[in-house]
Amino acid sequence: YGHGTQEIELPEEKVLQVINGNPSTKIEDVKQATLEAIRNPIGSEPLQKVVVKGDKVGIVVSDITRSWIRTNEFLPVIIDELNLAGIPDEDIFVLVAQGTHRAHTREEDIAVCSREVADRVRIYQHFSKDEEGLTYIGTTKRGTPAYINKRILDADKVIITGGITIHLMAGFGGGRKSIMPGVAGDTTIQKNHALALAADVGAGASLECASTKIDGNPLHEDMCEIAAMVNPCFLVNSVMNAEGDFSRIVAGHWYDAWLEGTKDVMTIQGVEAKAKADVVIASPGGFPKDINMYQGSKTYDTAGMALKPNGIMIAMLDCPDINEPQAFIDSFRFSDML
């Protein structure tokens, strides 16, 4: 719960099941695991061979709402590897993939990227509504106009980083989401996310856009189409175990390596419920997953799978950033779903 815990006591005979992630490996040496991944990548040449001296390299990182990824532990390794390939720090920049979220403070840049990286390379914030900072690169087959951050498009090579977990609309997080919505324009994001709605107004979410589902998922496929337009040269994504420790780091082709990581996620998170319960008490795992109610939606989604119809869900969310994102909070002013 936030940066701490909440304790509850329940009669043992009333507890149907305590659901945690399946047991999995824990990486003890994150630096060595990162080097192993980027030097023996999936579907790609090693990172040192993907870039060449003279390249301007942009690295996309997830924002503070995804700090569970622990980017600060593997990002310095990526930058050091680029140095070994002949790319100096002055030819590298980091772009924080806010999507529609607010900009970072300096302290949050340090928390996400590490103080070492914050002191070594330029860090920029993405603003989805800054039209002058965006470039149109095409329209997807589903009619989504792709506006992408100019800095990333101006880079010779783009590396995307992040973490993979279950996502209630896109099937899984990570991978292509670093580009869309990460560094996309607001118009692009709104059009893409609308694909998660059912065709009939008021019918709620599309059943094709659901946790763990990527085949036939229009939201996911639209994201992939936009990411392919940018065509990042490399990906590094983390997979975390139930305790929040690194279980695996995948690297390589922006789609193939990510897809391999989703299999690890299912091995850890694919826990079978014994039955549906009258009451489900759920936590997303504390900060930053409970930083606001919007991020908390991932808790409601998974908890709902274990809940009987008309049951009671108790979501444990600290929400220190309760007013973010503003567009989500503003939606509560409506008195109906139409």
Q: Model-predicted segments: where are they?
A:
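Short internal beta-strands
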Residues: 89-99, 237, 312-318
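C-terminal catalytic subdomain
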Residues: 290-338
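N-terminal amphipathic/basic leader segments beginning at the initiator methionine
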Residues: 1-36
